[in-house]
Structures are given as structure tokens and as C-alpha cells.
Amino acid sequence: MKLQNKPHTVRDIIVVGFALFAMFFGAGNVIFPPYLGVEAGPEWLGGFSAYFIADIGLAMCAVFALLRVGSSEAVTARLGKVPAAILMSALILCIGPMVAIPRTAATTFEMAIVPNISGVSSVVFSIIFFAIILFLCIRQSAVVDIVGAVLTPLLLIGLAVIIIKGVATPLGEIALTPNADNVILGGIKAGYQTMDALAALPFGIIILQSAASKGYTTNGQKFKIVSGSAILAGVLLLGVYMGLCYLGATVSTQYGLEIGRAELVMAIVEALLGKAGMIIFGVVVGLACVTTAIGLTSSAAAYFTELCSEKVPYKAFVIVICVFSAVASNLGLDRIVSIAAPVLDIVYPPALVVIFISLIIPKANDYVSRGAALGAVGASILCAFKVPAMENLPLYDMGLYWILPAVVFGLLAFGLAAVVKPKKKSEAEAKI
């Protein structure tokens, strides 16, 4: 088939790459790197590198795993139809309407509205916020273009103003020694706990749909535009995160680890740019949250539309998600996180397992995938119930306790497959 938009390939990569950057760059990603800079002090570059690999490195692995097998559904399909549907639905709900989408509104209200505008009701704000999300998401084919071509450039301008000012006129000297005991471990742990790799699966749904709508229909064409966009998004995230981490390092003699992450960022911005800086920061937080909310709402609606075989239209799911998220956002940010954190802790490890298997050994048999995922989810459930023995597992302190059980169960499943398949074959031959 002829590539319909071939003359615009570079433009499409830029627009889709900008959109992918903005979807990953939520408000939480604004506050993590500066705090890491305070923790690391003179070792901020090493801490940042560990953070970036564990955060965006994992997310990019998820994007390329998705590209390798063709779709988000194909990544989890090797688990079996029902387990795959349960895992993806739990994942979409947790990083969608149950947690991350309402959190975007709650974060915008607490970090952008309250410091700059007094007397605004959180209920009124949430209605306005999700009315905007509804308006921007209702046309599925336009979502990526709206985010990539309109909102992301504004977000990047706001971030550039803050970072360039902080680099040109540092707020202080970097501390001589780190404030944290193990900077690399802290960076890995912080990056892993952002769970951005999970978002890559639902974001992949709308990114691939956008590529198809632009005329990129073959696997090779989709790989070209999405891989190029992912690399661009990764480079932008690298620059922004590094800049924010450096800003934190420049105040490592002024603040200790007792300061809150959001409080630290607001203090840095106000010291750099004064009251005008707080307005700019409010715009940055608002845009970061809006773009992430758009991506999550659209991808969740697209997933559930496909799950029910389009018996319920995309627009209906967008409306339901926006209404539910508006209500949930008024429960308060801390309560939202506390409700869904245990569920996320359980679904994250098996999701990473199938992502890595799809990326590294895509031809692995389904027994291996199911066994490894079973080991990971079993370990996650035991940790959720705080079983003391789990603390003895390797990498427990980093939250990677599930790796050993996943490997062991995957190998056991591989051995089982080697025994079962020849047995079935011999039984079939005997019948002949």
C-alpha cells in the first residue's frame, strides 16, 4: 500500500514524539528529579542516570516491545485470553480512572491553583478540568495532534524558561557530600516506582492508532514513525529530567531530605523567578497534567471500546471516565494513591515480565510467559500481605523482589513444556 503521508514523515515523528513526551511527563515527573538532586548533591549525575534508566529506560523498553509484537494486546496475549484481559483491565483502571487520571486534577489543583488563586472550590475546578479533558478527547483521531502540536510546545517553553534560568544563575553551591547514603540505589528505586513503563502499554494503543490514521499501515511504516517518536520523546525527557535534577543539586546545601518534593520544586521556582515563576510553574503543572490526562483517558476509552467489541462507543467511555475521575479527584490526592497503590504493586511485576519477554525473547512459548508472570504476581501478592520471608529475597529493598520468583517459575514452566509437548505428540502417534 502506498504511504499516504510520506512527505510529512519528519513532521509526524515530531508531533507524535512531542505527544509521547507530554503523556509520560506528568506532574509527578516534575517533582521527582529535583528531590533526587538534593539527595545526591555532588553525585547528582550518577543518581540521575540510575533514575532515568529505571524510569524512561523501562518505558522505552515497553514501547519497543509493543512495536515488536504489534499491539498492547499482543504483549499480554501470551498469558491466555482471560488472564490477559484481567491484567490489562486492572492496569488500565489503575493508571486510568482509579488513580492517575483523578490524580492529574488533584495535583493541578494543589500545585497550580491553590498557590496562585484563592477561594477556588476543588469541586468546581474538577468539573472545569474534566470538561476540558472531555472536549479534547472526544475526537479520538485528533488526540495525538492536539497534544503534540499544540500543548507540548507550550509545556516545553515553560520548562525551558525554568531550567535555563536555573542553569544560568544557580541558586547555590552543590553540597560537598550527598545527603543520601546510596545515590544509585535511590535513583533506581525512584525511577522504578514512577511505574511509567505501565503507561507505555495504553499510550501505545493511541500512538499506533494515530500512526495508522496518518497513513502508516504496514509494520515497517509503523515501526519507523513510532520508534522515531519514542527516541525523540526519550531525548526530550532526558534533557528535562537532567535539568530539573541539576536544579535540585544547586540547593542541596539549603535543603535536606525532610522537605516535601512539591514544596521543594515550588521553592526553587519562586527563588529563581519570583511570583512570575509561580505562575509559569502553575502553567507547566497544568499542561503536564492535562496532557497526561488526555493520553490516559483516550487510551482507556479506546481499550474498553475494543474489549467490548465496539458495542459501547468510544465517546461513551470518554464521558464515563471523565465523570468518574471528576468525582474521584475530590477524594484528595493522598487517599487516591493509598487506595490503588496495592493493586498497582501487584500488576506492575507481571506486566514488566511480559514486556521483557516480548522484547527479548518474543518467540518464547506461552508456558514460559505464564510461569514467569505467575511467579511475579505470586511474589507481589505475598509482599502486599507483608509476609516476612519475602524480605529475604534478592533486590527486595529496590522493589525488585519479584525477579527471582519470575525466573524460577519461568524455568520450571519451560521444563514442563519440554515434557508435556513430547508426551502429547507420542499419544497422538499412538492413536494413529
Task: Name each model-derived stretch.
Residues T9-L20, L45, K81-C94, V123-I128, ...:
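Select transmembrane alpha-helical segments in multipass membrane proteins
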Residues V15-F25, I163-L171, A180-L247, I280-C289, ...:
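Hydrophobic, membrane-embedded alpha-helices of multi-pass small-molecule transporters
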Residues L36, T104-S121, A212-S213, A293-V320:
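Helix-loop-helix connectors at the membrane interface of multi-pass transporters/channels
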Residues G57, C61, L154-K165, G228-S252, ...:
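Selective recognition of specific alpha-helical transmembrane segments in multi-pass small-molecule
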Residues L67-A74, F130-L151, S213-Y216, A326-S338, ...:
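Membrane-water interface regions at transmembrane-helix termini and the short interhelical loops
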Residues E73-A77, V240-V290, E306, P342-L344:
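TM-loop-TM module centered on a large, flexible mid-protein loop between adjacent transmembrane helices
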Residues C137-G166, A340-L352, G371-V377:
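Membrane-interface loop-to-helix entry segments
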Residues R139-V150, I184-G187, I207-L236, T253-M266, ...:
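Hydrophobic, small-residue-rich membrane helices and short re-entrant helix-turn-helix hairpins
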